Swiss-Prot record:
Main location: cytoplasm
Protein's name in the database: Proteasome-activating nucleotidase
One GO MF term attached to the UniProt entry: ATP hydrolysis activity
Residue numbers binding ATP: 192-197, 331
Amino acid sequence: MSYPDDYSTDIEKNKMDLKEFKEKTQIAELESKVLRLELKNKDINRENVQIKKENEILKRELDKLRIPPLILGTILDKVNERKAVVKSSTGPNFLVNLSQFVDPEDIVPGARVCLNQQTLAIVEVLPKEKDYRAMAMEIEEKPDISFEDIGGLNNQIRDIKEVVELPLKNPELFEKVGIVPPKGVLLYGPPGTGKTLLAKAVAYETNASFVRVVGSELVKKFIGEGAKLVRDVFKLAKEKSPCIIFIDEIDAVASKRTESLTGGDREVQRTLMQLLAEMDGFDSRGDVKIIAATNRPDILDPAILRPGRFDRIIEISMPDEDGRLEILKIHTEKMNLKGVDLREVAKIAENMVGADLKAVCTEAGMFAIREEREFIKMDDFREAISKITGKKEKCSYDMPQLTVMYG
């Protein structure tokens, strides 16, 4: 069977087009495959770079683990620019050389250094040692109590401002008059009268650092621990100056010294002697003020009461009727009252301190909640005072008198 010439030409042309299409398809597939391989190669290269980085980090960590530990020592004496006498942590003393990486100016008696295990050469000077317990005593966040939140203590607030706040804020006033600012103040009075509250207000009103210490925290079991903690607290205060040290319940560490031979009493006395030395030591304290509080002034050691240690002793006494009224106004400021005469409440709440009056306000609110009311009546305050007074009668407290007074 024969085909026309045009038909044969078309067949040949179609064959050529099909062949060309197959070639283009193969080329496109190859180009796509090459592109995929290039992308895969880039991913592999990135992974390879990441693995190399991790490998370098692991090598450095491994090298650190292979480095032998250094020996700790303390400088006893500096012989010359390149030699020093060191007491090692293992016990004996050594005359050692300084590494070329150590600045001779940093080598002073008492400095902590690192020694090479083999040659005992000084390879590093460590920063001064700080007691973590003393560091934890610094209050980072200031209390939210101001002098406006304290009622009935206007004279005491004035006195504590003159002793603590004024020297820190306006030291030039004392320079003009030609006197040395007072160093510290002792607050004493019955529990609940606002001694700790005053210290919180001082911390709020001043921009100084605030270190709070409870007297019992300075009493330690082993010999020298309490004295070391006292030194570290004052060292921290100097570094953070201007600074205020508040020692609450100071009678725990500053009670009268006796002839007792028990080990615990002797350690408390050592701590007290270190406290006395820090309060009026050879070195100036700078802008470091001390506030102490106690409700047992009768058992304090006379040595700590003399001027130069506590220049002003302030009694935080029981509030009078006007003082109780001020305190009640502060505590009832946000309370929903109806028909309540605070002056009458202040008269009824005789012999109550600030903490008692705060408890009275809380109890009055609880009585209102118990009766499903959204406001507080006068009867609620009467019942609250009766309840708090009954508790006070069960555990009465007679305030000891401080025979030595000045300031």
